[in-house]
Amino acid sequence: MISMSVPRKKQEREISLLMHYVDDVFPHQFPIYHSQFVGKREWLLPLLSSTRSVYYATLCLSLLHKEKSSNLDQPGSVSFCQEERLRYYILALRETQQLLQQLSPVCDLEAMRSCVPSLASALHLISYESSCPVYGDWKVHLQAATSLIPILVGGWNSMIKPIKHTSTLWTGLTLSDFHDLHTEGSLSYEDASALRFLTNALAVTGILSFISTGPTSALSDYRYLMDATCDMVQCDQFLGCENWVMSAILDVGLLDRWKREEEGNRRLSFRELANRAKRLEDCLENGIRELSAKTSGSSDAVSSITRIYASSTLTYLHSVVSGLNPDLSEIQESVSRTIELLKELSNWHLLACLTWPLCVTGCMAAPDHEAFFHSLAISAEISPHSLRHTWIVLRILKDVGKVRGSLGEQILPTWEQILCIDGAPILLT
């Protein structure tokens, strides 16, 4: 726990901001994460007050949420809030950089203990930088978080016993599954719970970011994370989308990277491209059929979200293979399927978890579907005052419509060119 000597009034205000994060910001950021999962939120407050880096990053994010959600109609109030937010941000940035610089590359207990607040701070700064009106360089913080993947994977697999049971780690892990948790020579239960959650947050953020940044070399890091963590990553309990679809999104990104590299070397084989794409398409189609058969007539949130992500991933796949051409029959088919699934949603608030598929589908949809996406925004009460990025989809769709009009019959540019506002890439989380 951090120890700081600050005036009482300031201390009270900072504690109030911490509780605002716990009560309002955290549920808003992660609406699918429920208290029945292992660890509940018992790890959250200890984490937020564990180091100066996490503490300050939480305060600046909490202030940003207050600023966006409150009616600060007095210029003085707005100015004070912004100044405080910027001050905490600078402190968080400095402390996080120091923490990362001190982190040992050796995967031992001390590195794991330091890795938890380092990752938490980086993820907070990503949320802060990627939100309106900040729109800063969230990519540098994601790069820092991605560099922690080897420590996360190595530490998790070495410090948690191999567990064989029918349920997932998040729903089946108990204290007896840890090595000597009562001693100082082991990872605490709170740290282990935070580690699970933060690793899932990193996996989801990283995988969904590549459509905005382009298929970088970091794709391989996330493939390693998904394959090597022995069920630690459970995206359905974090985002509502099952792992197999998140892996498919990752594989489409890897296909995009391979295609661009082959094109750059003037050796792209269209037959090989078609074969690779067909394997991904078959995997997605089979997964959708199996899920639909298991959940026929069900309004379960995870199955609904997973099918929407899977269907929109097909659109993403077709756009990578054939270009961003909304007139292609295969793109029209997957777009229509996704729109039908969106219409079947029984809970409009689930749209908060669907920024990525909404954007992919909306950008490739026919112009006559524009009214449908606006009606979704109204139904879900999507607002620019939110820390989530669902509302920005509407602006992107409007910009894409303008680009289409100017290009005529030409296809749209790359995804990373589309998903950019005022020179900053938009994170679709």
Swiss-Prot record:
One annotated GO biological process: positive regulation of transcription by RNA polymerase II
Mutant phenotype after disruption: Reduces markedly the expression of hepA and abolishes the production of heptelidic acid.
Membrane-spanning segments: none
The organism's place on the tree of life at top rank: Eukaryota
GO cellular component annotations of the record: nucleus
Keywords: Nucleus, Transcription, Transcription regulation
Molecular function (Gene Ontology), one example: transcription cis-regulatory region binding
Subcellular location as annotated: Nucleus
Pfam family membership, one: Fungal_trans_2
UniProt keyword Isomerase, yes or no: no
Main localization of the protein described in the UniProt heading: nucleus
Family affiliation: Belongs to the TRI10 transcription regulator family.
Role description: Transcription factor; part of the gene cluster that mediates the biosynthesis of heptelidic acid (HA), a sesquiterpene lactone that acts as an inhibitor of glyceraldehyde-3-phosphatedehydrogenase (GAPDH) and a growth inhibitor of the salt-tolerant lactic acid bacteria in soy sauce brewing. Both hepR and hepS regulate the transcription of the heptelidic acid cluster, but they are not involved in mutual transcriptional regulation and act with different mechanisms.
Protein name: Transcription factor hepS
Organism: Aspergillus oryzae (strain ATCC 42149 / RIB 40)
Gene name in the database record: hepS
